[in-house]
Amino acid sequence: MKTPKMNVESFNLDHTKVKAPYVRVADRKKGANGDVIVKYDVRFKQPNQDHMDMPSLHSLEHLVAEIIRNHASYVVDWSPMGCQTGFYLTVLNHDNYTEILEVLEKTMQDVLKAKEVPASNEKQCGWAANHTLEGAQNLARTFLDKRAEWSEVGV
């Protein structure tokens, strides 16, 4: 049975054929004024086989969202996938895949050096009790350990 074409790019991805961890271009959009938005699928866990626990995912979201901007001014957003297997990295007017991998590598290395999860308090976070620095660092370490495989999506 053929799956119908969906509006959401990731719904058209055959999740049974990917090999996490990986980083792939999920979408490109060109604006009316020439701006280009590129969305990357940054997959940490194998779909339908493993997932990140919420406190670790939540903490890694905070850490990367804050730290990645030290390495790249063109970052628009770093947001978690609802399936808890990865994140989306959205950038503006920057379409250099190799550089994105380098920025992600530097960011994850900085996550390993972090002493606290940024903005993990009730004033700055909607679920402040749901954080673990150690869990986030374990995710970053595991992702970095497979750095040589990030370009191997498997599709």
From Swiss-Prot:
SUPFAM superfamilies in the record: LuxS/MPP-like metallohydrolase
Catalytic activity from the UniProt record: S-(5-deoxy-D-ribos-5-yl)-L-homocysteine = (S)-4,5-dihydroxypentane-2,3-dione + L-homocysteine
Pfam families on file: LuxS
First-level EC class: lyase
Gene3D superfamilies reported for this sequence: S-ribosylhomocysteinase (LuxS) (3.30.1360.80)
Binding residues annotated for Fe cation, in chain numbering: 58, 62, 125
Cofactor(s) required for function per UniProt: Fe cation
Family annotation (InterPro entries): LuxS_sf, Metalloenz_LuxS/M16, S-ribosylhomocysteinase
Function noted in UniProt: Involved in the synthesis of autoinducer 2 (AI-2) which is secreted by bacteria and is used to communicate both the cell density and the metabolic potential of the environment. The regulation of gene expression in response to changes in cell density is called quorum sensing. Catalyzes the transformation of S-ribosylhomocysteine (RHC) to homocysteine (HC) and 4,5-dihydroxy-2,3-pentadione (DPD).
NCBIfam families in alphabetical order: PRK02260.1-4
Homology family: Belongs to the LuxS family.
Assembly and binders: Homodimer.
HAMAP family: LuxS (MF_00091)
Protein name per UniProt: S-ribosylhomocysteine lyase
Native source organism of the sequence: Helicobacter pylori (strain HPAG1)
